């Protein structure tokens, strides 16, 4: 079985798939008040209709990726709430799965990723905890009207490894 080693998420390597931002350690210039610092518009995205914020619980398993999904008309946000999370992504491919092109990223707790429309992905996986709690941000009912899930043939399954390899390029979070 093919192994995909996770890379710590970084702007250069993740750019083809989306964007990300630490929500607990944001960078950049804040708008400040007496008791607050506000970091506006760190991630943005368009939406037709109502946005929905949905909790997800994911149990730790063998990290064998057997399927993926994509959304043709919308991006997806995922926020790691109580653990670092492992996500896998593959490039948009016109509806034909490309598991051989999958990449894995380790996303720190408190970070939000925005996965672009048409990018292959599935639920985040817990890095350390037995159960990961995360928040999914999608237009309302996307799971029912714009979610294509494809099960891979067994020969295309891959193992997501938590052993972190170094980023292929070095870049700062933007």
Regions found by a protein language model. Give the residues of each.
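N-terminal leader/capping segments at the start of a protein or of a new domain
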Residues: 1-47
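A short glycine-rich, His/Asp/Glu-containing loop-to-beta-strand
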Residues: 38-67
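Glycine- and acidic-residue-biased ligand/ion/polar-headgroup-sensing regions
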Residues: 72-93
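Betabetaalpha-Me/HNH-type nuclease active-site subdomain
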Residues: 92, 97-100
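Conserved interaction-surface patches within small, structured recognition/assembly domains
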Residues: 100-106
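Conserved metal-binding segment of the jelly-roll/cupin
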Residues: 107-122
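A short beta-strand-loop micro-motif that forms or neighbors metal/cofactor-
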Residues: 119-147
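Single conserved hydrophobic/aromatic residue that forms the stacking wall/gate
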Residues: 162-174
């Amino acid at each position: 079985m093919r192994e995909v080693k996770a890379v710590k998420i970084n702007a250069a390597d993740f750019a083809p798939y989306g964007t990300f931002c630490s929500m607990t350690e944001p960078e950049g210039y804040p708008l400040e008040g007496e008791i607050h610092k506000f970091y506006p518009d760190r991630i943005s995205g368009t939406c037709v209709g109502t946005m929905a914020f949905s909790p997800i619980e994911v149990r730790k398993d063998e990290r064998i990726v057997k399927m993926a999904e994509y959304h043709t008309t919308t991006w997806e946000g995922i926020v790691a709430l109580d653990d670092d999370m492992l996500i896998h992504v593959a490039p948009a491919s016109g509806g034909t799965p490309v598991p051989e092109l999958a990449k894995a990223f380790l996303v720190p707790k408190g970070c939000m990723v925005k996965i672009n429309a048409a990018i292959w992905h599935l639920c985040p996986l817990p890095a350390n905890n037995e159960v990961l709690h995360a928040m999914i941000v999608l237009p309302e009912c996307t799971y029912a009207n714009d979610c294509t899930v494809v099960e891979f043939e067994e020969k295309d399954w891959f193992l997501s490894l938590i052993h972190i390899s170094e980023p292929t390029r070095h870049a700062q979070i933007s």
